[in-house]
Curated annotation (Swiss-Prot):
InterPro entries linked to this entry: EFG_II (IPR041095), EFG_III (IPR009022), EFG_III/V (IPR035647), EFG_IV (IPR047872), EFG_V-like (IPR000640), EFTu-like_2 (IPR004161), G_TR_CS (IPR031157), P-loop_NTPase (IPR027417)
Domain of life: Bacteria
Compartments where found: Cytoplasm
Cellular compartments per GO CC: cytosol
Database matches in HAMAP family: EF_G_EF_2_B
Binding site for GTP: 13-20, 80-84, 134-137
Organism: Borreliella burgdorferi (strain ATCC 35210 / DSM 4680 / CIP 102532 / B31) (Borrelia burgdorferi)
PANTHER family reported in the protein's UniProt record: ELONGATION FACTOR G, MITOCHONDRIAL
Lineage, broadest ranks: Bacteria, Pseudomonadati, Spirochaetota, Spirochaetia, Spirochaetales
Gene Ontology molecular functions: GTP binding; GTPase activity; translation elongation factor activity
Protein name per UniProt: Elongation factor G 1
Amino acid sequence: MDYNKLRNIGISAHIDSGKTTLTERILFYCNKIHAIHEVKGKDGVGATMDSMELERERGITIASAATHVEWKDFPINIIDTPGHVDFTIEVERSLRVLDGAILVLDSVAGVQSQSITVDRQLKRYSVPRLAFVNKCDKTGANPYNVKDQLRSKLDLNSVLMQIPIGLEDKHIGVIDLVLMKAYYFEGKDGTEIIEKEIPSDLLEEAKSKREIMLDTLADFNDELMELHMEGKEVPTEIIYNATRTGTLALKLCPVFMGSAYKNKGVQLLLDAVTRFLPSPHDIKNTALDLNNNEKEIDLKIDNELPTVALAFKLEDGQYGQLTYVRIYQGILKKGQELINSRTSKKFKVGRLIRMHANNTEDIEFGGSGDIVALFGIECASGDTFCDPSINYSMTSMFIPDPVISLSVKPKDKKSADNMAKALGRFTKEDPTFKTYVDIESNETIIQGMGELHLEVYIERMKREFKAEVETGMPQVAYRETITRKAEFNYTHKKQSGGAGQFGRVAGFMEPLDKEGETYEFVNLIKGGVIPTEYIPSCDKGFQKAMERGTLIGFPIVDIKITINDGQYHIVDSSDIAFQLAAIGAFREAYEKAKPTILEPIMKVTLEGPTEFQGNMFGLLNQRRGIITGSLEDGSFSKVEAEVPLSEMFGFSTVLRSSTQGKAEFSMEFLRYGKVPSTIFDELRKKFNDQNKS
């Protein structure tokens, strides 16, 4: 394989922009599949890249299936990424290992909310991109408008490389503005490309658009600028070089168009991928040297150097765990010994394969820059594999925090075992899916990037792991505390024949206001009124009493306890007697110390178009939010607020519907704060009602 010709590309888009259909056509024209199936087609086959049963049913792409194709002797690895906001980690993951991308846009809807999110991710990983304006056959198609939106909404220097021949139901082909030729796609499935002269009624428009294209490209090539200014003909190769230079420098976004569904324009888009998107040689990648203070090391596309590879996706295959790997340096071959830099464990490379959606092709080795898959390797997503002579780690992928939680409960013993297996699998596969058991409520809580994200996992539990589960709302982790000082003087006495129990503890409790501490114990006992060996028993008893408050049954925090007096009995006093005395003393004083309830307060950040700023403020105010800051950056707004966690459930859905899906939010724990009296009363009533029942 000529690695200078290799292209690692992703296809990113808003949901329903026709991205999976485009990928399907690419597979067909590259002879990887021999029949075309629609995403939600009548034949029940579904798109080839949507290999998970659930994806085919919903008609949305969930897992980024990888496939290897060849176009005119250029090897291309394609990662098909999900277009729904809830699957953002899949997009982030694939962009991490890509060298270039195709941004697919709907010719009617144009730049949509997820296009903005995807573009932000492409920028985060400095991925050069081409734009493909799809669905030019749709009613209301306007590719020129989409090209303008790329500038106004995404701030991309978009340049038309083609114009359409007809739109809506009259869309029959495209005009190439570089070659100044018209292209039609005929024969069954558009496999016959017919090159003709530009129709006379479109010639003037084509000339005018070519002028604009050359003006834009002149910034990237001095020779082109001179020839264009002198009114001379610019050679095709110079135009291609200028386009490639601008694209690789992330200063240009060439725009192509067509209709994947109607088989128009796909082959010319593939030509553009090979011409304008980078090979692994064109991209700088770095690793951190763990043996040298995490010093940044430049990696080289060279098969002779020590191997460095990144595991970027895990799947359960029929032969065990399938690990997708991008090779950044050196080679991967069967039988090779590597080390996982996170665990320091050595392993041997077993079966090495190339993927075509969910079909596999065994290979002997993969070279620098390639994307391959391994079977039977124990690892987590994001792990780095390297030659044992070095200890490098690829910089970690940006992983957004989960924003929604749900409690899950297995319906029976078999489901409980299967659910445990499923949760173990999912957390390994997806770093944005988290799970834990809430110690206080004993519920299993799952967390993710949105309702659909968690729904898909609950469905997968049922289908793949045969785990029947019920879902509910998770409980907020409240706390209790006191608001004033209170004294205690409590005697624990149990004398009913035989060994008795006796212990008296006196002192006071007060609110503790110390950063990072929730409990403090002070011993002011003098003259041995409580023997030294029983002081730890008192401490233990107070801490035991704080495990469950009397208001709503949650742990008690932020209390300082001081003991200054007491009494013991030479026979009946014991460790347990003083523990019980301390528990009694605590409860006696707690009621007098005016206890209250604390709730988790989250730092919430909303980002979205300025036109929705009012909606964002409104949503936060409705949720007892306190706005702490806002920032306007042209058409984009950022709002920061402190909001109680209990008000944030279901927020992603509400935010999406009130901002047309154009705003995003992140949330992290900030501190505990006192609940208002109305909430206090509600929580008390709920707790008392539960205890009665």
